Amino acid sequence: MLTTPTRFVALRIPFRSSNKIPISIAPSPKVFPRKPVIRVPASLRFVATMSTPAAAVNATVTVTDAGRGSITHVIFDMDGLLLDTEKFYTEVQEKILARYNKTFDWSLKAKMMGRKAIEAARLFVDESGISDSLSAEDFIVERESMLQDLFPTSDLMPGASRLLRHLHGKGIPICIATGTHTRHFDLKTQRHRELFSLMHHVVRGDDPEVKEGKPAPDGFLAASRRFEDGPVDPRKVLVFEDAPSGVQAAKNAGMNVIMVPDSRLDKSYCNVADQVLASLLDFKPEEWGLPSFQDSHN
């Protein structure tokens, strides 16, 4: 539940109609015991703007309660969410574009994040206007040679180890669904193999069941099927993502999703997620019916 002063703004989706839509107040003991909740038609979206500094990325949280209290399984993205690898992609892609006197901006990066390598490469060369000089395939080869020395130095994102160990220790099934292919996955995780061994399974971008990359739901649906009791009811799955395409993929799979975006990402990309956090350290498991942390981190 929100504990800070909250302002709710109802946004009609789509905006064309001016008809009034009734809102009713009804008790919902399952989600908020002994507290009234606002029930609204699907055509309304409520955004809670908390009284926190404007710079905080979690100042805006989309409030939905469909999956609250019913989560049984958790799926994690990897790059930019568990591992601090997105900076490597940015560094390399900036260097490549500099040769063509072009700059790499966050609007393009936002579109590339979370996608399969070839899909991201096509976006890169097409939208940066260098496709006549550099093919998507050649871009991948060049980028690969620059990244292979950087990936083994990957650090964990804040709160990643704490959250993974907590959920695993409490018996919550966890796994990874990433657009990264197998060879890069091995390079990125080689310093953290003990932690990643806690995963029930990993679905990578080159998995034969993943026909299309994010925002298609293939990866998350494959991950759901591979749990011991799978396929899991998507309403009982919580996904953690940092990329807009990954958030949309989770929603396309019918799952709940928490977004932990880079602070430089435009906030307009964060509207689809069920909850937006500045860091994994800010996650409160009990809000989703999961066991609370036992440590004192606030």
Swiss-Prot record:
Domain of life assignment: Eukaryota
Reactions performed catalytically: sn-glycerol 1-phosphate + H2O = glycerol + phosphate; sn-glycerol 3-phosphate + H2O = glycerol + phosphate; 5-amino-6-(5-phospho-D-ribitylamino)uracil + H2O = 5-amino-6-(D-ribitylamino)uracil + phosphate
Segment annotated as transit peptide: 1-46
Gene3D superfamilies for this protein: HAD superfamily/HAD-like, Putative phosphatase, domain 2
pH dependence: Optimum pH is 7.0.
Tissue: Ubiquitous with highest expression in siliques. Mainly restricted to the meristem of immature flower and vascular elements of the root, shoot, leave, siliqua and developing embryo (at the protein level).
Residue positions of the active site: D77, D79
Subcellular localization(s) per the UniProt record: Mitochondrion
SUPFAM superfamilies attached to this UniProt entry: HAD-like
One Gene Ontology term of the molecular function aspect: metal ion binding
One Gene Ontology cellular component annotation held by this UniProt entry: mitochondrion
Biological process terms in GO annotation: dephosphorylation; glycerol biosynthetic process; riboflavin biosynthetic process
Uppermost EC category: hydrolase
Pfam families hit by this protein: Hydrolase (PF00702)
Alphabetically ordered keywords of this record: Hydrolase, Magnesium, Metal-binding, Mitochondrion, Riboflavin biosynthesis, Transit peptide
Requisite cofactors: Mg(2+)
EC number annotated for this UniProt entry: 3.1.3.21, 3.1.3.104
Residues annotated for Mg(2+) binding in this entry: D77, D79, D242
Family matches, as PANTHER family: (DL)-GLYCEROL-3-PHOSPHATASE 1, MITOCHONDRIAL (PTHR18901:SF41), 2-DEOXYGLUCOSE-6-PHOSPHATE PHOSPHATASE 2 (PTHR18901)
Similarity comment text for this entry: Belongs to the HAD-like hydrolase superfamily. DOG/GPP family.
Function: Acts as a glycerol-3-phosphatase with higher stereospecificity for L-glycerol-3-phosphate than DL-glycerol-3-phosphate. Can also dephosphorylate in vitro 5-amino-6-(5-phospho-D-ribitylamino)uracil, also known as ARPP.
Name of the protein in question: (DL)-glycerol-3-phosphatase 1, mitochondrial
